[in-house]
From Swiss-Prot:
It catalyses: L-glutamyl-tRNA(Gln) + L-glutamine + ATP + H2O = L-glutaminyl-tRNA(Gln) + L-glutamate + ADP + phosphate + H(+). The gene is GATC. SUPFAM superfamilies: Glu-tRNAGln amidotransferase C subunit (SSF141000). This is Glutamyl-tRNA(Gln) amidotransferase subunit C, mitochondrial. Subunit of the heterotrimeric GatCAB amidotransferase (AdT) complex, composed of A (QRSL1), B (GATB) and C (GATC) subunits. It comes from Canis lupus familiaris (Dog). Residues 1-20 form a transit peptide. It comes from the Eukaryota.
Length: 155
């Protein structure tokens, strides 16, 4: 009987130490340290607007063509969302191992179970050169903005 009490006491201490809790330990739930800030995020730093020069630069780096106003609007929404995430005050917040705070997760050992299957993997490639995957053949840099068809960014 005392072994069970020690085991539950030790489990409660380990759960408290890691910042995890379970429904079986109501005493630990009162002491649990959460790993996310309780205060609301600060106001965003920018409005998400992107200049035509930045869009051209991103198109050349990412080999993506933002050919419509809808694509530019989607990019601006993504940047505004990233600005909101950047504005969150994370000072004093411990790094998390998992988003599941209520259970202890154990990592599996990293063992190789199969190997030397390069030939099998390369069979899935569209194009192979000397045992290497080749990037998609359409992956060429975009022409500069003055060489492209006119497009108005309305900024």
């Amino acid at each position: 009987m005392w072994a069970r009490a020690v085991r539950f006491g030790l489990r409660s201490w380990v759960a408290w130490r890691r910042g995890f809790t379970s429904k079986a330990d109501p005493q630990v739930a009162k002491q649990v340290r959460t790993r996310y800030p309780h205060s609301p995020p600060h106001s965003p730093q920018g409005n998400g607007r992107v200049s035509a020069q930045v869009i051209e630069h991103l198109e050349r780096l990412a080999l993506v063509d933002f050919g419509s106003q809808e694509a530019v609007a989607r990019l601006e929404k993504a940047i505004a969302f990233a600005d909101r995430l950047r504005a969150v005050d994370t000072g004093g917040v411990e790094p998390m191992e998992s988003v599941l705070e209520d259970r202890c997760l154990y990592l599996r050992s990293d063992n190789v179970v199969e190997g030397n299957c390069a030939e099998e993997l390369l069979q899935n490639a569209h194009r192979v050169v000397e045992e290497y995957f080749v990037a998609p053949p359409g992956n060429i840099s975009l022409p500069k903005q003055d060489e492209q068809e006119p497009f108005s960014y309305n900024h």
